[in-house]
Amino acid sequence: MPKVQADGLPLPQRYGAILTIVIGISMAVLDGAIANVALPTIATDLHATPASSIWVVNAYQIAIVISLLSFSFLGDMFGYRRIYKCGLVVFLLSSLFCALSDSLQMLTLARVIQGFGGAALMSVNTALIRLIYPQRFLGRGMGINSFIVAVSSAAGPTIAAAILSIASWKWLFLINVPLGIIALLLAMRFLPPNGSRASKPRFDLPSAVMNALTFGLLITALSGFAQGQSLTLIAAELVVMVVVGIFFIRRQLSLPVPLLPVDLLRIPLFSLSICTSVCSFCAQMLAMVSLPFYLQTVLGRSEVETGLLLTPWPLATMVMAPLAGYLIER
């Protein structure tokens, strides 16, 4: 295990650490986009309705949303390296579980577990980059990381189309197994530990539960609205979300080390950025989930054609991401 460095890792170890980060974040991002193209095929193979098969995507996204902050906090407590390795193990095993699933319920459960693994990888990704790169190259490291995320998102539909053209949808998940093993071996060898801390922050379980309920109910309500669920049920979910959210915010304001630093929301520009990001994420998710069904069921496109037709959207994001970063610096 590399020793803690005052200013990043030395070059031989740095390359190995960067590689495991690249593999891990690529898998986590890809699995958020790669299943969309296969949803009609999965629904047919598992004898599920199109509406119920959407939970293959929703389960993964909701698991990430409700656990991301908690894993980030646990990384501060127990070490980013440890959380990252645990995330790789969970992601690897749950990917195998996904491939072996023979019912929609089993696949949905596997995707929930996989989402927790993906959240663990994403939550400590930026913190590990700060430990890996020297301070003078930190901006470059963040830029490379953003580029990998954009490329993985853009490549998702194309990779899915390529795999589905020659193999079963199960291989969308099986491909993670060898990649996960390689990333885990690299992580054990090259990732640095956390720097020493005077004291460890205390994990607040009620905050984690309220965080999960607040964001989980929000995503569930939005998904239910898109699927045409009962407005009464959706309204009830939103009411519970607001009530729990109020208690969650009040508790965060009273904690010395909160799970979510809500005091930052008092900054108008920060609040506007968060609201814009949430709305953008919801709109993109609704479109990326519904478009494969429209293209394959209504327009009669094949899986390969669907993947290619979905590629320009994230590809444009990949092209614009570096430009946006440059404009932010200006």
What are the language-model segments listed below?
Residues 73-206, 224, 233:
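Helix-loop-helix hairpins in multi-pass membrane proteins, especially solute transporters
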Residues 15-30, 35-37, 50, 206, ...:
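12-transmembrane solute porter fold
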Residues 61-62, 150-151, 314-315:
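Short hydrophobic/small-residue motifs within alpha-helical transmembrane segments
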Residues 38-67, 106-109, 299, 304-309:
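Extracellular/periplasmic helix-loop-helix junction of adjacent transmembrane segments
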Residues 40, 72-73, 126-127, 160-161, ...:
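Small-residue-mediated transmembrane helix hinge/kink sites in multi-pass secondary transporters
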Residues 165-276:
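Hydrophobic transmembrane-helix bundles of small-molecule transporters
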Residues 69-80, 320-330:
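Helix-to-loop junctions at the C-terminal end of transmembrane segments
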